[in-house]
């Protein structure tokens, strides 16, 4: 919504709706309001809306003990964001991240595969990508395959392809177009990054299922190479997982993924098959995820994966917090920094600026702490 141009103001309607299915015995409208605000807050800090609102039957909300107080807190924090940013833009990395699918700029964030926050088992493992990106320090472009054919823009550092095979999300038959695969191979070979989630570049053709299996270092076993030896061993020691000390959630995942080539490293594995793989291709890098549902930990893994794929891991700590349940947004023009706690528990985190430890913070559950940028 905040990307819409040519309108007087933008407004987002937050959840929950004031409907009887939520405001009923056994319902938890306060819990839903908190959870949805924490997700929305990440995105609003990056690309703010002008207004927020709620919808439904007002009487239901007014009769629920404590709910109005919770909404007053949300509104107060929303105003606080605008007071501190003063209409300025937040800090972003020195490269853009591109989401590649069949819609490109036509649908943009609507390619999230979800409607009204309705859960679908078939899609939640892919939805995490855009949910995570919405609160990250990156300018995000949405490109289609004609954009690839016309020439990948120079300011794009990482291309992400997400979705099931033979869908508009992943690209279907576009992946057997020589112009497309050649352009992306050239992009990565010269130092660009490529991240795939689920069945990226998938289209069975000429003995390959993932048409960029050479770039990603993985392919999917479709029954044609069962007798081919696959020497896949896991080595989780990598920049991408340095903050991670608990099991990674791949959601439903993607079965029968195996690593192949000479320059891959398997970071996570389920039995004999791979779940998280990095690969070097020329001067560039790729990362493959079997699935990536939204969670604070997966946000951190994707953040690190993007900087790794872009070949700029040192840039990550330009502004950085150590605890995976916390995130940081910086407004250079107003010299204000927001550190947010995405957990329902107290969290401690260290704040880094330009690679140097600046402060150690203890944040209350769901807190948004504003500090001065002393840079």
Where are these regions (language model features)?
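A glycine-rich, often tryptophan-bearing local segment used as a flexible ligand/cofactor-contacting loop or short
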Residues: 171-246
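A short helix->loop->beta-strand "cap" motif at the edges of active sites that frequently abuts
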Residues: 6-8, 190-193, 284
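A short, well-structured beta->alpha microelement
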Residues: 130-152
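Catalytic beta-strand/loop cores that center a nucleophilic Ser/Cys/Thr
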Residues: 224-282, 290-301, 306-359, 363-364
């Amino acid at each position: 919504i905040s990307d819409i141009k040519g309108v007087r103001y933008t407004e987002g309607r937050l959840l929950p709706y004031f409907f009887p299915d939520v405001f009923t015995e056994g319902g938890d409208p306060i819990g839903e309001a908190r959870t949805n605000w924490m997700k929305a807050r990440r995105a609003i800090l990056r690309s703010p809306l002008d207004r927020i609102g709620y919808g439904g039957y007002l009487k239901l909300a007014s009769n629920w003990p404590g709910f109005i107080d919770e909404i007053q807190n949300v509104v107060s924090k929303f105003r606080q964001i605008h007071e501190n940013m003063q209409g300025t833009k937040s800090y972003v990395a020195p490269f853009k991240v591109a989401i590649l699918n069949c819609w490109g700029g036509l649908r943009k964030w609507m390619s999230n595969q979800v409607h009204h926050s309705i859960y679908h088992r078939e899609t939640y493992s892919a939805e995490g990508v855009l949910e995570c990106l919405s609160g990250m320090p990156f300018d995000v472009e949405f490109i289609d395959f004609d954009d690839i054919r016309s020439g990948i823009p120079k300011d794009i550092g990482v291309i992400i392809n997400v979705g099931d095979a033979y869908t508009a999300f992943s690209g279907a038959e576009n992946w057997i177009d020589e112009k497309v695969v050649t352009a992306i191979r050239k992009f990565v070979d010269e130092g660009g990054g490529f991240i795939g989630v689920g069945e990226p570049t998938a289209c069975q053709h000429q003995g390959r299922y993932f048409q960029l299996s050479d770039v990603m270092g993985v392919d999917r076993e479709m029954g044609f190479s069962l007798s081919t030896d696959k020497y896949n061993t896991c080595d989780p020691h990598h920049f991408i997982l340095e903050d991670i000390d608990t099991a990674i959630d791949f959601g439903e995942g993607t079965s029968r993924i195996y690593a192949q080539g000479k320059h891959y490293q398997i970071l996570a594995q389920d039995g004999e098959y791979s779940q998280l793989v990095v690969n070097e291709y020329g001067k560039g890098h790729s990362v493959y995820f079997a699935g990536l549902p939204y969670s604070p930990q997966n946000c951190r893994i994707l953040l690190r994966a993007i900087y790794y794929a872009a070949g700029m891991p040192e840039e990550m700590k330009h502004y950085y917090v150590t605890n995976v349940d916390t995130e940081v947004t910086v407004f250079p023009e107003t010299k204000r920094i927001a550190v947010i706690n995405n957990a329902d528990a107290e969290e401690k985190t260290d704040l880094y600026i330009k690679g140097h430890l600046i402060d150690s913070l203890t944040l209350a559950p769901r807190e948004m702490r504003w500090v001065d940028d002393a840079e």
